[in-house]
A protein has these predicted regions:
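Juxtamembrane "helix-exit" motif on the non-cytosolic side of transmembrane helices
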Residues: 28-30, 60-64, 87-96, 140-148
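Membrane-helix interface and helix-disruption motif detector
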Residues: 33-42, 91-106, 144-154
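Aromatic-anchored segments of alpha-helical transmembrane domains
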Residues: 16-22, 79-88, 136-146
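N-terminal topogenic module of multi-pass integral membrane proteins
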Residues: 1-67
Length: 169
């Protein structure tokens, strides 16, 4: 029963996170401006695509993504909540309170995400190469955009990668 729930979560979370990126204008949420740039959108899509292909590969090869322990599920859900808080809190220089909240959630999500990448890299040798590729894509993304201003957008991309790669039995 729990495997089925985790399979569904592993499939739905990335899709639910991808929907706002497609259908809503970033201007409505008052983004920092990174994702409003057309080149950044194309680069973001390039970074998201390998994660989506990896998800498709796992499901077609009947190797579903599932979470081994309840702690891992809680950890991922906590990271998801932090990322969503970053995603939906506006960053506006004229409103320092909301800007600080946005940066607070963004920085916490960033450090938790890095710890999760490290944990998966050392604990799961099966996904080690995939982690390296996704980290490289994230590095290319942030260095090409030459800015950490769009931290929430960057976390949005990396959280999709993280939610696709979980521990296996």
């Amino acid at each position: 029963m729990s495997k089925k729930i985790n399979q569904v979560l592993g499939f739905l979370i990335p899709i639910l996170l991808f929907i706002p990126y497609i259908f809503f204008s970033p201007i409505k949420f008052n983004y920092t401006g990174l994702i409003n740039d057309t080149d950044a959108k194309l680069l973001s899509s390039f970074c998201i695509l390998p994660s989506m292909l990896f998800l498709t590969y796992l499901f077609y090869n009947k190797k579903p993504v599932y979470i081994k322990q309840k702690k891992w599920l809680i950890y991922n859900l906590f990271l998801l909540v932090l990322m969503l808080m970053t995603f939906f809190t506006p960053y506006n220089k004229s409103e320092p309170v909301t800007s600080n909240i946005h940066l607070f959630f963004g920085v916490i999500s960033f450090y938790i995400m890095i710890l999760e990448y490290i944990a998966i890299f050392y604990l799961d040798s099966h996904n080690r190469n995939i982690i390296c590729i996704l980290c490289l894509l994230d590095f290319i993304y942030i260095t090409t955009c030459m800015s950490v201003n769009g931290l929430s957008e960057w976390i949005f991309i990396t959280i999709i990668s993280i939610s696709l790669i979980t521990k296996k039995n």
